[in-house]
Regions:
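Start-transfer (signal-anchor) and selected internal transmembrane alpha helices
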Residues: 1-34, 68-169, 353-356
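Signature aromatic-anchored transmembrane alpha helix within multi-pass, membrane-resident enzymes
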Residues: 89-102, 156-163, 271, 358-362, ...
Length: 644
């Protein structure tokens, strides 16, 4: 029989470590993780690498033997280093082995494709890092005496991270802009909208409006009810440049860490809440908002997250203000606002929490689609409709085509996009709370729009931001349930909650690795022709009507009349006084469907009596319309293409 002290110590260990897990379950779990890691190693490093079948088997057996050896070694070292008994060390290592579930998230890429070895190594490193984190969390749960107080607070660390994050992402953003790495047309479009607004024309841009609409359209409000553009006006007034829009957008993105921290802090410790905020900023759909072409929709996350926070805190008036701010970003936020009303109904809240958001969303939808858009469209067909026209001309016809031809949606790109959207959340972690359902309309719209050639099913475009907010919210709001589950099992809730948050952090980093390719690095490279491109843009008079290559558009967007030289012949009123021709088609970053029109423009200019060459080099030719001459360029019907 043990002494009283020994009995108390044993009881303390059991209280710290949670209830005893039957040995059979531990064995099954470890065996499952072992088989998973073995399969992943085979798929990532052995299969499809040119090895013969016998050699593949030898390498696989060697890898499995190495895993067994490392497992035994880790168990021995842990037991001796931290003076743990067999039960404690086993419990810690079983818990820590869960980190390798991260490999399962990206196993399909390895089984169905052949990812770069660098990506596989980075994923392996991420899994090992997560294993170390889990080990630390579990060890401190077993031995609370090992806990220590960091010299700085979690809030200060998060603030420092956000400062570094903002300057790093903004440096990349500006480097990409100066390296002509952006396609450029969307950035130039919104820059011109702000310029024309300051000169008496509300959010007007002939660069798109004269191209996409057969009838006169004089405002961006014909396509989107995004009154948030007014937010950019004072900043643009201070510095009239495309870079201003990009920097302001990045500020709004990094500020999202604030409401995420507040939401997480409701159920987590300060340090775990800070990790959750960092994880959100590193999710690919959020991180790439800082780098991709500009869109006002990137501002939607901040008010949505604050709306979620005030919803959870039951602060009704601030909640309504946040909803209003979110709705001002774009008309399709009505799905999110209405969804939050339904979430309140699910939670059986009072009538005002349900009725007011739902009624507001319906009224805003009616105002946008029945009043605002018809007024500014002036009878023209909405450009947005081209994204879905392939499905049919009426809602009923579209629905029938979707039901009878599911292959229209179940394309490789759409399936890959859906997977990339959920990778950062382990594919399933968001399912623990119904908040994720609010993301469904947005994912569906993106998948449907992709079939119409609108490039909406891309995880790093602005379209993916709103669904990501609600997928992440599904994880955050489930943490309270995770804690309750742990308590019912007699375990420390902080341990399981930490496991979820840390898993999302490493899954977000790993997902970013898998969606980042060589193109993202090439966009930052300085090329030999960049200096001349800057000189060419500077040669164009500030008040002249100009047509330039798309990548050059942001540099010359501060003017009343702006055209894409790539599609100049497709404009309804092509009246450019200066036309810049890039002689290298590869720099145009365009598909072959535009090549014929561009070649036709070059031939017309070479034989034109109205346009004269004022600059010519191996890279560029600048044509100037003679004084008093009319452009008289022929018009060709524009291809159906969406701008955003």
């Amino acid at each position: 029989m043990g002494t009283a002290t020994e009995v108390q110590l044993e009881g303390s260990k059991q209280a710290q470590g949670g209830r005893q897990i039957p040995r059979i379950y531990k064995t099954r779990w470890v065996l499952g993780i072992f088989l998973l890691v073995s399969l992943w190693i085979f798929a990532a490093f052995i299969r499809g690498r040119g090895y013969s079948r016998p050699l593949q088997m030898v390498l696989l057996v060697a890898a499995m033997a190495l895993l067994i050896g490392l497992g035994w070694l880790a168990t021995t070292i842990v037991r001796r280093q931290f003076m743990l008994d067999r039960e404690e060390s086993t419990r810690i290592l079983v818990f820590s082995s869960s980190a390798f579930l991260l490999l399962a998230v990206f196993l399909p890429e390895c089984l169905l494709g052949k990812p770069f070895l660098a990506r596989s190594f980075l994923l392996l490193i991420s899994s090992l890092a997560l294993f170390a984190m889990y080990f630390s969390v579990s060890l401190r749960a077993e031995r609370p005496a090992l806990n220590f107080r960091p010299p700085v607070s979690a809030g200060k660390v998060l603030f420092l991270f956000c400062v570094v994050y903002f300057f790093a992402t903004s440096w990349i953003t500006l480097s990409k802009l100066h390296a002509f790495g952006y396609v450029g047309q969307d950035i130039a479009y919104f820059t011109q909208c702000l310029y024309t607004t300051l000169h008496g024309h509300l959010f007007y841009s002939n660069m798109y409006h004269d191209l996409l609409y057969g009838k006169p359209v004089t405002s961006d409000l014909a396509g989107h009810n995004q009154l948030v553009l007014f937010v950019f006006l004072p900043f643009y007034l201070l510095h009239k440049s495309a870079s201003t829009l990009l920097i302001v957008r990045n500020i709004f993105v990094v500020l999202c860490a604030w409401p995420v921290y507040l939401i997480a802090r409701r159920v987590l410790s300060p340090w775990l809440a800070a990790v959750a905020a960092i994880a959100f900023l590193l999710v690919p759909a959020v991180l790439y908002q800082n780098f991709y072409d500009f869109a006002p929709l990137s501002l939607a996350a901040l008010p949505l997250l604050f709306a979620l926070y005030f919803f959870l805190e039951r602060s009704f008036k601030p909640y309504l203000i946040a909803l209003l701010c979110a709705q001002l970003v774009r008309e399709d936020l009505v799905f999110a606002v209405f969804g939050l009303g339904l979430l309140a109904l699910w939670q059986r809240r009072s009538l005002r929490w349900v009725a007011i958001p739902c009624a507001f969303a319906l009224l805003w939808a009616f105002f946008s689609w029945k009043i605002l858009f018809p007024y500014f469209l002036q009878g023209a067909t909405p450009a947005v409709a081209s994204c879905f026209s392939y499905l049919g001309s009426t809602p009923g016809e579209m629905l029938r085509n979707i039901v009878h031809h599911p292959g229209l949606l179940l394309t490789h790109k759409n399936v890959l996009y859906t997977k990339q959207m959920v990778d950062s959340f382990g594919g399933v972690l968001f399912l623990m709370n119904p908040a994720w359902l609010i993301s469904v309309p947005y994912v569906a719209i993106n998948i449907l729009g992709e079939g119409g050639g609108c490039n909406t099913a891309m995880v790093y475009r602005h379209y993916s931001l709103i669904p990501t907010v609600f997928l992440f919210a599904g994880v955050l709001l489930a943490l309270e349930k995770v804690g309750s589950f742990a308590r019912r099992r007699g375990e420390r809730p902080e341990t399981l909650q930490a496991a979820v948050v840390l898993f999302v952090l490493m899954a977000a980093l790993s997902s970013t690795v898998f969606v980042t390719g060589q193109q993202q690095f090439d966009d930052l490279q300085t090329r030999s022709w960049h200096h001349e491109a800057i000189q060419v843009a500077a040669m164009l008079p500030a008040d002249a009507s100009v047509a330039v290559p798309r990548y050059m558009l942001p540099s010359v967007a501060n003017r009343e009349s702006l055209y894409q030289s790539l599609r100049l012949l497709e404009y309804h009123h092509p009246d450019a006084s200066y036309i810049v021709i890039d002689k290298d088609w590869q720099r145009m970053a365009a598909t072959e469907q535009w090549r014929e029109n561009y070649i036709g423009l070059r031939q017309l200019l070479e034989n034109s009596s109205q346009y004269k060459v004022i600059y010519n080099s191996a890279n560029y030719t600048i044509y100037k319309l003679c004084d008093g001459c009319a452009a008289n360029l022929p018009h060709r019907e524009p291809m159906k293409e969406m701008r955003d």
